[in-house]
């Protein structure tokens, strides 16, 4: 299915993998394919998911480039200085890691996208708001490490960048 309609060459509702890659790029296509469904029902490639993935990946890339230094002075921060928000985020990361690992083992890639992509991006925004834009570097490093490791099987080019 394409955009909730049955694919058909005669009606023009048809898109090849090459066309998807040319239109959305490899990473957004892979996210949309993983989100298309992993049950016995017909998979539904939704162009709005691919378009949203392009935007989300671009915003994430720009945020990483502008806000995350390549090296962090961990000596100036102690891991014991976690506040309530740091502990909440650390616990959420641990919970999400478990859910995503189970989803990968069961090959339920839609659930992987839900937790490893959508939920982690929302978690970052909530954390930054709660910390008034001044996150703990240990938590931030763990967040990025978790995000990139969990998404590497689906969007390896982005994660290795």
Where are these regions (language model features)?
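Long, charged, mostly alpha-helical binding arms that flank functional sites
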Residues: 1-142, 150-157
């Amino acid at each position: 299915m394409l955009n909730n309609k049955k694919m058909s060459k005669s009606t023009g509702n048809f898109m090849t993998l090459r066309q998807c890659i040319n239109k959305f790029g490899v990473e957004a296509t892979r996210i949309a394919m993983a989100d298309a469904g992993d049950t016995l029902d017909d998979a539904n490639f939704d162009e709005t998911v691919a378009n949203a993935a392009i935007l989300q990946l671009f915003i994430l890339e720009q945020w990483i480039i502008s806000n995350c230094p390549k090296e962090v002075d961990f000596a100036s921060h102690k891991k014991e200085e976690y506040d309530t928000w740091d502990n909440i985020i650390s616990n959420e990361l641990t919970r999400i890691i478990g859910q995503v690992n189970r989803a990968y083992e069961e090959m339920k890639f839609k659930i992987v996208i839900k937790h490893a992509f959508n939920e982690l991006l929302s978690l970052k925004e909530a954390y930054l708001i709660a910390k008034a834009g001044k996150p703990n570097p240990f938590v931030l490093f763990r967040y990025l490490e978790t995000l990139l490791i969990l998404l590497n099987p689906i969007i390896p080019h982005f994660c290795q960048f």
